[in-house]
């Protein structure tokens, strides 16, 4: 599967980003490269290969360098107010963002 210029223009419109002709051409090349890689991965024979929880776990000599899932700071109203003060628009303790899906 390969994307043409119209496909890239449609993707850009859906993502609501404006691309110059040069950017559109580069995006087309990059997206087609990604799709080619995906096709190669899908063609790989994985029959009998057990799924991995993480790709690094395939290597015995490499320890997983994943950080523990631990709370690093306690939530507070002061911190919440500080974060919301940086938002362009906030109401009732929530960030307000423009509608992006029609």
From Swiss-Prot:
Its EC number is 6.3.5.-. Gene3D superfamilies: Glu-tRNAGln amidotransferase C subunit, N-terminal domain. It catalyses: L-glutamyl-tRNA(Gln) + L-glutamine + ATP + H2O = L-glutaminyl-tRNA(Gln) + L-glutamate + ADP + phosphate + H(+); L-aspartyl-tRNA(Asn) + L-glutamine + ATP + H2O = L-asparaginyl-tRNA(Asn) + L-glutamate + ADP + phosphate + 2 H(+). GO terms for molecular function: asparaginyl-tRNA synthase (glutamine-hydrolyzing) activity; ATP binding; glutaminyl-tRNA synthase (glutamine-hydrolyzing) activity. GO terms for biological process: glutaminyl-tRNAGln biosynthesis via transamidation; regulation of translational fidelity; translation. It comes from the Bacteria. Keywords: ATP-binding, Ligase, Nucleotide-binding, Protein biosynthesis. Transmembrane segments: none annotated. Allows the formation of correctly charged Asn-tRNA(Asn) or Gln-tRNA(Gln) through the transamidation of misacylated Asp-tRNA(Asn) or Glu-tRNA(Gln) in organisms which lack either or both of asparaginyl-tRNA or glutaminyl-tRNA synthetases. The reaction takes place in the presence of glutamine and ATP through an activated phospho-Asp-tRNA(Asn) or phospho-Glu-tRNA(Gln). Belongs to the GatC family. Heterotrimer of A, B and C subunits. HAMAP family: GatC. PANTHER family: GLUTAMYL-TRNA(GLN) AMIDOTRANSFERASE SUBUNIT C, MITOCHONDRIAL (PTHR15004:SF0). This is Aspartyl/glutamyl-tRNA(Asn/Gln) amidotransferase subunit C.
């Amino acid at each position: 599967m390969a994307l043409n210029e119209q496909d890239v223009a449609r993707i850009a419109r859906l993502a609501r980003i404006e691309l110059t002709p040069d950017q559109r051409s580069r995006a087309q090349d990059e997206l087609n490269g990604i799709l080619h890689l995906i096709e190669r991965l899908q063609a790989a024979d994985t029959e009998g290969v057990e799924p991995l929880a993480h790709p690094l776990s395939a290597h015995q000599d490499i320890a997983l360098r994943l950080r523990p899932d631990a709370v690093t700071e306690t939530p507070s109203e002061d911190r919440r107010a500080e974060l919301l003060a940086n938002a362009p628009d906030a109401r009732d303790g929530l960030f307000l963002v423009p509608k992006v899906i029609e």
